[in-house]
UniProtKB/Swiss-Prot annotation:
Function per UniProt: Electroneutral K(+)/H(+) efflux antiporter involved in chloroplastic K(+) homeostasis and osmotic adjustment, especially during plastid division and thylakoid membrane formation. Collaboratively with KEA2, adjusts alkaline stromal pH upon light to dark transitions in plastids. Together with KEA2, critical for chloroplast development, including chloroplast RNA-metabolism (e.g. rRNA maturation, polysome loading and RNA-protein interactions) and plastid gene expression (PGE), ion homeostasis, and photosynthesis.
Keyword Transmembrane helix (UniProt): yes
Name of this protein: K(+) efflux antiporter 1, chloroplastic
Native source organism of the sequence: Arabidopsis thaliana (Mouse-ear cress)
Domain RCK N-terminal, chain residue ranges per copy: 995-1112
Alphabetized NCBIfam families for the sequence: 2a37
Residues annotated as transmembrane: 586-606, 613-633, 641-661, 669-689, 699-719, 734-754, 767-787, 828-848, 861-881, 884-904, 913-933, 949-969
Highest taxon in the source lineage: Eukaryota
Primary gene name: KEA1
Subcellular location: Plastid, Chloroplast inner membrane
Amino acid sequence: MEYASTFQRPILFHGGDGASYCFPNRLISPKGISITSGDSKVHSCFRLRRNVAQSGTLNLMNACFSGRFYSGHLHSTKSILGNGHQAKRIPFGFRLRCQGHESLGNADSNDHRIGESSESSDETEATDLKDARVENDTDSLEELKELLHKAIKELEVARLNSTMFEEKAQRISERAIALKDEAATAWLDVNKTLDVIRDTVYEEALAKEAVQTATMALSLAEARLQVIVESLEAGAGNDIPHVSEETEETIDVNDKEEALLAAKDDIKECQVNLDNCESQLSALLSKKDELQKEVDKLNEFAETIQISSLKAEEDVTNIMKLAEQAVAFELEATQRVNDAEIALQRAEKSLSISQTPEETQGQLSDEETSQEDAMVLSGNVEDVTHQVEKESPKDGDLPVVQITAELVPDIVGQRNKKLTQPYESSDHENGKPSVESSKVVEADSEKPKINVQTKKQETQKDLPKEGSSLNSPKASFNKSSRFFSASFFSSNPDGTATVFGSLVGSVKQQWPKLVLGLALLGAGLTLYSNGVGGNNQLLQQPDVTSTSTEDVSSSTKPLIRQVQKLPKRIKKLLEMIPHQEVNEEEASLFDFLWLLLASVIFVPLFQKIPGGSPVLGYLAAGILIGPYGLSIIRNVHGTRAIAEFGVVFLLFNIGLELSVERLSSMKKYVFGLGSAQVLVTAAVVGLLAHYVAGQAGPAAIVIGNGLALSSTAVVLQVLQERGESTSRHGRASFSVLLFQDLAVVVLLILIPLISPNSSKGGIGFQAIAEALGLAAVKAAVAITAIIAGGRLLLRPIYKQIAENRNAEIFSANTLLVILGTSLLTARAGLSMALGAFLAGLLLAETEFSLQVESDIAPYRGLLLGLFFMTVGMSIDPKLLLSNFPVIVGTLGLLIVGKTMLVVIMGKLFGISIISAIRVGLLLAPGGEFAFVAFGEAVNQGIMSPQLSSLLFLVVGISMAITPWLAAGGQLIASRFELHDVRSLLPVESETDDLQGHIIICGFGRVGQIIAQLLSERLIPFVALDVSSDRVTIGRSLDLPVYFGDAGSKEVLHKIGAGRACAAVVALDAPGANYRCVWALSKFYPNVKTFVRAHDVVHGLNLEKAGATAVVPETLEPSLQLAAAVLAQAKLPTSEIANTINEFRTRHLSELTELCEASGSSLGYGYSRTSKPKPQPSDASGDNQIIEGGTVVI
């Protein structure tokens, strides 16, 4: 058979089941290097202690990449120490240390020689050890490079092998499909022949009836003839009658003769008819026999073809398994290449780290020598300068500096002469010319420079290798904050533009806003300094004395007092302006204007900061104009009440983007991970507050539960800005936040019951149980009413309003639904945001969700920004300065502690360590409900106002740093997750909460565009690719891209193919496309498959393999070019649109039917319900052509 070809495994030591390969206990290379898997150290045959220690720093264990290593390829290319190694001696006198200003430390020649020999011997030994270690490290690097090169070759072979098997699988599958079609055709022929036989049998029956009828007719004709003959014979036997009787008898005889002739004719006709019927019957019988024989032949042929088709199906299954194994070997080869690259990078880093101290030590010794020389020179220069000052007149013609500059070269020359004298004497004594000795000195002095330059070049070469995946283009994905490469703040000597330069340019463009912001800041500092009175001591500094060579001055006034001089003049000018009293309405208007002004100034500025977010801008604006800043906002409580609706609209928008099915798939993390996070964090923080901080039991309970909550508004906003809402950590974070919104109800019910002012006199478990039971009943009734009313009333109400075509009424109805459900849940004891979330979840099932989302977008943005500003208003900078260590310590414990707890909990629930860290960093800050809980605790006498103020500040600052914590999580993922290919493999626990998602098979050009469109609409998807580089690019963009074979049943199961609604197959190779479609149609037939076809023939084969719809990859570019050409030919736009649409419809009939059923065109032209009406062909008015000849349709 064609598919019965084999491929060999790499020559490795098998270390277990599957495809894991590892070292044996000991491998001995032919050149004396032994590698031990226990401690993974390289020991040279010379057994030099320093060399062994240095080889330990090299860590060849890095080469044992994750238990997999090539065994037969390890060998040493050269010995660790060269055979003819010659140590270079450093001539005596080069490193003599000078004592005094001009003395050089004279000694007799014997002492010089003894010192020279001992020093040179030590340096020779150290040089030998160093060279041995360097050569050993170099050998190891060469071995690793050779291993990497062989791994790359094996990867190329594996890729060719997998491509070959995929092509064979496609050919065998197409042959099987052809045999199946042929068998179907054969059975169709059999059935047709059987139908003909049935018709023949029917005709035979008719013919038999005709024969019987003809036979009966012949019998009747013969009977009539016999009667006539008998009557004639009877008439001839009578006597002769009279004349009249004779005449009558003659007439009778004539009639009988005529009847006899007619009877004979009838007999002939019946005989002819009978003969015809018998001939037809015989023909039908012969035809029937022939047809039966043909049926037997066709049946036998069809059975043969059917058997061949079944065998072909088995062959297809076998070749698909072989192709899957080939792709699996390709993936393993990719992993080995990745492991080899990591091992090589680590080895090079360890080598560079081990060589850096030696170079720095040599550079330090050179610097010490140069410093001694400089000290001698400086001493001589000072003496000469002193003499010149004495000898020169007071108003000399030349300045002292110029005279000194002229005398320095002479001193240097004298110093060089004194230094070269020992060289010359020693060289002449040894019989060597002085020129050679000077060359040796120059060569030794230039060695460190060359080594440093070569190492810098090597490290610069290594940097692109490590950061290639992270430096991939990310501009195609619309995300607000990304990470910057190492060259972000570096300046290019060639004068090319850098990111830092562009940042400076943007600051220059925004200088009016900066000036206005600084003016507001200065005014705020002025008002603050004037208002604090005696509290200015916080800004004062102790007396600082600054001395210089000219004078001594002391400054005792802080900077704020110097700034106060300017505002006094401004105050005088303001007093001259007539004032007018401001009423409450104008005050509210001024508050609104200040809020808008601050947001317009600070939000763009903070977006320019690396890793910045609009949330930070709103928080900074709130701090500045809040009661603890400039105190510009007068009605803070009213502002906070209105700002709460920002969270309400945010949760409503989140509900619109979800569905009931997707929410049900998240129940494991909502009620599992969410409850575990809240309970464990509350318990740990409460115990710390009680036993460490000495807080009372009720206060510890409130503190633990309040700090266990996180900010739903901040976290979801940051996730949306970064485009991470559909990522693994984004989904897990949202699940926990959803449960926290439910847990707030319990906390707010619990606070009055544990208050010392309560009528129960403390904690009463019966009262708590009764209150919680009543709250649960109220919540259940409210949620049931919202769900039932929404399912029954929302769709007909919105349909009726949509028929009126009034946008204002539509928006008003949306606001009514949001505020009504929020009020209902608030009256039931739940949060307002939860009611809005339920309303959005119900509206998401209707066809009006997109319009509703666009209507509430302006309200959501403004109110959410207002909410963040109110959070900033709660931050007290004065309190931060006075309690800085306590607040920073508490903040650090909160962030680190909650992150560790969430990581542990997330790992228990099957989340990867990197995703769990990112979830922990997002949920570590406090939340907005902590303000409500702590405020209620103060009102109930559970905690003091001072403690609540400190906690307010900690929670506010933690919410402010949430964007940077999210950026830190992405940095951790980019540093630790992207290096190892195994971390990119699909895990079932990473996708078990997905429902109705999209599977993208292939993350190339087409797959990336589809992923971008889905990500912008927050539609959940999972992408697969066998290229680790593409997967790394996707992961660096926080997209759910996994390294795996899209044609494997196990991989498809791990990404939740059974719960997916559709799959897009956009692989490069036609064979891989076919194999993926085959696997999806066989194992997951309910998943609709949309495939990218290479050409029409390939598309037909894919349709036969089970593809739902096939899109030729050349169709859309051809249509775009054709539209441009038709537009250039002066055809009207309507005619071009109709032509292109008709052509597309003919070639995409199946896709068009699906689009019409869903009510949209999915990007493939106009739907039939919205075709443009034909317009008069006016070439000047209808053709809308942009630059380049493309058409705007």
